[in-house]
Design a protein with these regions (language model features):
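C-terminal regulatory domains involved in ligand/effector binding and gene-expression control
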Residues: 1-56, 61-272
């Protein structure tokens, strides 16, 4: 199988960590892989760009335990790959043709990932967090779509009420929000808004249509597109490309990587 590997240049012996779903050890805040006690975390954005833009067998040199978050999207990675260009390797690319429908669900969380047989690879994502701000959002990625333009610039998002405990424990610094869209679901009292202005060192911070105005949205379904970006990054951990149509509702790194393990097992059984 054609898989990418991370090389931890900051550690003695420059250990290698394969970017495969078998090595996933944590999905709480992004996807983390580990081999021989060495980890690399938040790999999904760079994996998304590499995989979708057709790069296999990459060696990713890294001098830290986490990939650079950049602006919270895969834009910088996609731009670098597109500008550098991709060279053909002297090897045939392996594809797994999906032969039967495969379903993965976490019913209590409303999560579902379904894979159907198809001649091409495509992904549709639906997000619904019972949020009056986000509402129902859909995003699709079909063969021939421009990933670098359409998907890679879409940034990660977080709900303000999820941030509040972290803010109270001083785990969030001012610059931390330059790479996340903050969704404000509930009314924010004036004193809390003042507190946010101080933390983020932005005196003109305000809430606009349910979002903190630290960032402008890049498109109206940016959140669904970002979930799609993440899902593509987790698909990269299969180590083989597939021909099939994916439909995902409320995907997340735990569900994505569990689904990949299940799919990998199916592929192994099929002996491809």
């Amino acid at each position: 199988a054609a898989s990418d590997v991370y090389k931890r240049q900051d550690l003695e012996g420059q250990p290698i960590i394969p970017a495969l779903c078998d090595y996933v050890v944590d999905t709480s805040r992004g996807t983390t892989i580990e081999s021989g006690g060495h980890r690399v975390s938040t790999i999904e954005h760079i994996m998304s760009a590499l995989w979708t833009l057709g790069v296999d067998n990459a060696v990713i040199d890294i001098d830290a335990p986490e990939t650079p978050i950049m602006d919270g999207s895969a834009c910088a990675y996609a731009k670098a790959i597109t500008e550098t260009g991709v060279a053909d390797q002297d090897a045939e690319r392996k594809f797994y043709h999906v032969t039967e429908k495969m379903v993965y669900t976490i019913p209590e969380k409303g999560v579902a990932i379904i894979l159907y047989p198809d001649d091409e690879f495509s992904v549709s994502v639906h997000v619904d967090y019972n949020s009056k701000v986000i509402g129902n959002q859909y995003a699709t990625f079909n063969p021939g779509d421009n990933y670098a333009e359409k998907i890679s610039p879409c940034r990660t998002f977080v709900f303000l009420h999820e941030l509040e405990p972290l803010i109270k424990m001083n785990l969030i610094k001012g610059g931390d929000l330059d790479n996340a869209i903050v969704v404000v679901e509930n009314p924010v009292p004036a004193d809390q808004l003042e507190h946010l202005k101080k933390i983020f060192n932005k005196p003109d911070i305000e809430i606009k249509a349910g979002y903190l105005n630290n960032l402008e949205l890049r498109c109206n379904n940016e959140l669904a597109r970002h979930k799609l970006l993440d899902l593509l990054g987790d698909f990269a951990l299969l180590g083989v490309r597939i021909k099939g149509r994916v439909w995902a509702t409320r995907p997340g790194h735990f569900a994505n990587t569990e689904f990949m393990k299940q799919l990998k097992h199916t592929i192994r059984r099929a002996g491809e």
